[in-house]
Amino acid sequence: MKNIEEHLVEGHMKVTLWGGQDWFVIVDAKIDTGADRSSLDIALIEALEFLPARKSRKVRSANGVTTRDLYEVSIEWDARPHRLLVSGADRSRMRYPMILGREDFLDLCEISEEE
């Protein structure tokens, strides 16, 4: 297992996303310490059949402040299952289909280091 510093130096990490029909995909997630929470490409959300969490969040981006739907996402990282609440966004033109925000990244690392 890599420690927090190694992931931050690399700036990204592999995350397995588990979908509604036990489908999964491994994505390269960008660690973004400037983002509070995580975001996932809406095409992946639809393909993996993630359901909306019936919540939304105001998100500040380069395009201004928008309201995005939130989705409960099942992931596997460091050989352990986790659940994240992510916002959906069109990331089709971006290098990374997932942004792992600071709070979620620290939560994942904290859980891994406790075990």
Regions from the PLM with identified roles:
Residues M1-E115:
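Pepsin/retropepsin-fold aspartyl endopeptidases
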